[in-house]
Amino acid sequence: MKLHELKPAEGSRQVRNRVGRGTSSGNGKTAGRGQKGQKARSGGGVRLGFEGGQTPLFRRLPKRGFTNINRKDYAVVNLDTLNRFEDGTEVTPVVLKEAGIVKNEKAGIKVLADGELTKKLTVKAAKFSKSAQEAIEAAGGSIEVI
């Protein structure tokens, strides 16, 4: 096979259908838009969610919930990720960022108790779950809320 013998796979290339170019084309006159009406006009058509004047679904359904403006979003760190540090290390948000464990600190760091901690560490973070606090202290480490 040579370069000039290459051909696209059968049916992979189709010619664009040019509508409104004479009745003999099969897509002339109304150009696939049917007879008159809103959808036949240029720029015609109804807006998203419009149901012909009937109250649309999004307005028939009740509103639900709200967004709490006081919500704080914490960056989560689990115990098994803290195992990569050496014994006796002081783990701070800066150290976590440098290690690539946390990309965005958000409202602070919260330590959760997923996995097991085997190292003795001093962990400094904004929040700790109760079980994470117990696990860190059980491993001989200490916590500090900052």
From Swiss-Prot:
* Keywords, in A-Z order: Ribonucleoprotein, Ribosomal protein, RNA-binding, rRNA-binding
RNA-binding recorded as keyword: yes
Where do Basic and acidic residues bias regions lie? 1-10
Q: Which InterPro entries match?
A: Ribosomal_uL15, Ribosomal_uL15/eL18, Ribosomal_uL15/eL18_sf, Ribosomal_uL15_bac-type, Ribosomal_uL15_CS
Disordered: region residues:
1-51
Family from the record: Belongs to the universal ribosomal protein uL15 family.
Its quaternary organisation is: Part of the 50S ribosomal subunit.
Query: Which HAMAP family does the entry link to?
Result: Ribosomal_uL15
Quote the protein name from its UniProt record: Large ribosomal subunit protein uL15
